[in-house]
A protein has these predicted regions:
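Periplasmic-binding protein-like
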Residues: 86-88, 252-255
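Structural recognition of the beta-strand scaffold that forms the well-ordered cores
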Residues: 21-25, 72-75, 81-83, 125-128, ...
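Extracytoplasmic "Venus flytrap"/periplasmic binding protein-like
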Residues: 1-55, 69, 91-92, 184-186, ...
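Extracellular/periplasmic catalytic domains that process cell-envelope and extracellular macromolecules
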Residues: 14-18, 33-35, 63-67, 74-76, ...
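Solvent-exposed loop/turn segments at secondary-structure junctions
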Residues: 2, 27-32, 78-81, 88-89, ...
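Extracytoplasmic/periplasmic substrate-binding proteins
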Residues: 158-250
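Short helix-initiation/N-cap motifs at beta->coil->alpha
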Residues: 1-10, 105-110, 174-188
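Helix-loop-helix "hinge/cap" segment bordering the ligand-binding cleft or interdomain interface
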Residues: 43-53, 61-132, 144-177, 240-246
Length: 255
């Protein structure tokens, strides 16, 4: 980002061939760019709402600025699911069928009830309270800042309350994502029931290619979980001042 920021600052004075035409952003820092004049409104490229009728709304929300102007497009969304340990599901719930398992995690209150069942049989429901934060936070209905005041959404407070209750009950831990303790549940002896993530998590980050892991022999199932969410994705933004606007438009529509 540092190189991109420095180059964008010089965009107006750069020779035509040295100007940035487009750049990519991720959801976690998209607003840093789309809420500035360094990115072009999509409509200024000649892309109409009808061209975007099949895009999921959240992929547009991520790159919509504070004035409601769409400033980017995505070809790669990463919707998430609940990945569950099939053997743990059979042991505690009596089934590893995705539709049946979904009944035990269909909302947060039911999820919490199931956590107690898991704990009684020696399993953690999730590896860490940090596993669920993204799911709760993707489903807020208000902004973090309201005028000059910090606002804490009700769904964030529910995450706080639910997380504390699970930790107090010994149903989960507080380790950081990507830590060694967090990844112990990738193996049977870690005794973790579920993780939340998109396809890239189970394919590339849960030791699926390591013999002895749960994923190595297809031991993870997938259910919708308590709430829909996403984690990751890539968005294309057009840089203000590009001299190749038509090409940027074509790339966006093609992707």
């Amino acid at each position: 980002q540092n190189n991109l920021d420095a180059t964008l600052l010089n965009q107006a004075d750069a020779p035509a061939d040295d100007k940035i035409d487009l750049f990519l952003v991720e959801a976690d820092y998209a607003l840093k760019y789309v809420d500035t004049d360094y990115t072009m409104p999509i409509k200024d490229l000649g892309i109409a709402d009808s061209d975007l009728s099949k895009q999921y709304q959240y992929t547009k929300d991520i790159v919509t600025d504070s004035k409601g102007v769409l400033k980017g497009l995505s070809w790669q969304g990463c919707p998430g699911v609940l990945f569950y340990n099939r053997e743990a599901a059979k042991d505690v719930l009596g089934t590893d069928d995705p539709d049946e398992v979904q009944n035990y995690v269909c909302d947060w209150d039911t999820f919490n009830d199931t956590a107690a069942k898991m704990q009684a049989k020696g399993y953690k429901m999730i590896s860490s309270v940090n596993d669920t934060y993204r799911v709760y936070s993707n489903n807020v209905t208000s902004k973090w800042v309201d005028g000059n005041k910090i606002n804490i959404d009700d769904n964030i407070m529910k995450w706080v309350d639910d997380s504390k209750a699970q930790v107090d009950a010994g149903e989960t831990g507080t380790c950081d994502l990507w830590s060694d303790d967090w990844s112990k549940g990738f193996y049977p002896q870690g005794k973790v029931f579920c993780y939340f993530g998109p396809a890239w998590l189970v394919n590339f980050s849960m030791a699926a290619d390591t013999e002895g892991s749960i994923g190595y022999n297809g031991g993870w199932g997938a259910a919708q979980g308590p709430q829909g969410f996403f984690w990751g994705g890539t968005w294309i933004c057009a840089a203000q001042g590009t001299d190749n606007a038509n090409l940027v438009k074509d790339i966006m529509l093609k992707m």
